Amino acid sequence: MTDRAPAVESSDRLSERGSMAYLLWFFALVYLVEGLGQIGGLIAQPLTYYLKQVQGWTPVQITAYLTLFNLPWIIKPLYGLVSDFIPLFGYRRKSYLLIANAAATCGFLLVSRLTVPDQLVFALMLTAYAMAISSTLCGAVLVENGQRLKESSTFINQQWLWYNVAAMTAAIVGGQLVQRLVPTAALHTAAALVSAAPLLVIFGTLFLIDEKKAPMNIQGMKHTFEGLSIAFRRRHLWIIAAFIFLYYFSPGLSTPLYFIMTDNLKFSQAYIGFLGSLAGAGWIAGAFLHRRYLKKLTLKKLLNLSIAIGTLASLAFLFFWNETTAAIISFCAGLAAMIATVATLTLAADYCPRRAEGFAFAVLMSIINLSTALADNLGSYLFTDVFHRKLEPLVLLSAAFTAFAFVLVPLIHLGQKRQGDPAVAAMAPPPPDSR
């Protein structure tokens, strides 16, 4: 072996020692922070409760307000392009990670001092952009290494396992804050607590990531754009994008359910938080179920299984009558969501074109975020203005949308493709011989 400085050994360590362990720890750390720091994390229930109780907003207004924070997630491909080709202080990943997570901490500290929704939106938007940038960088690492090691589903499983460990914790703490504090104090306390989470990523970036300094790569940009041009002329990639959009476009139940639990079923805010933690436990159970029993399935079988389980989980909300049934249904819904997430994200990762993996994966993730945001707004609108705050017809419609995905699976022509096997070897030109 040749002698090299420790600061530039990262890629050699990953290849010589087996990169799996390093990658799994990295994904665990980033997604642990993301589970706490997203708008849907620790601050979610305190924010929703504040807007409902203090501002007197309806489900439609709350959902529309929260949808604003999906914008940074919808434009994720932009962050991928910038970080790939415009190094900041000589680094493509490290500098952006440090700045983004420092901004997230500042944003949450600012939220802890504001009360007016028009002012809160700017501070919360800062945190949303920061979390989206961190997630984009992590996604690029996942696709590049997942295709190389044929372990896309393993990495996705790991990410979402730790995301939901954080989500479980966030749901319990958020519920307790709302139960024990007045709405404004609960919101401010949640923001102050979550402001510490991005510091973990800053620590990991400084002490766990070695990255070579790199100049702006004009030639690499040219080859990647050639790969993108070829990839986006491929009909199959467009079919997959359409499938993912339709798969996730199911009228959302989350905000309507919050109003049902609060106003109709009279659940305490602590119990609502506990139900969120049970959903997180279901996600974790789904992760272990996939690792133990489902990893060997073909991707087609996994997708069909996820649709079947998702449809049944949606229909189960017809029995959302009391605390006991709510607990069982929340756990099952989380389990179904985890299997669906592994199935669809594995599909996305396996079909990303070579030399444009990070950008293409970010595009497909943006499609999921856009579809989910539209579906959530549709669900709240139907619940409020069409179904007159009746949950049952919304549940039936949501289940029907989920079941419709069965019709779409044959259009992808997956055959016997296994999870994690790259399906895009010929979708982009090979990398140039010269460096």
Please provide the spans of the model-predicted regions.
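C-terminal transmembrane helical hairpin of 12-TM major facilitator-type secondary transporters
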Residues: K300-T344
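Helix-loop junctions at membrane interfaces in 12-TM secondary transporters
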Residues: V111-L124, L318-S330
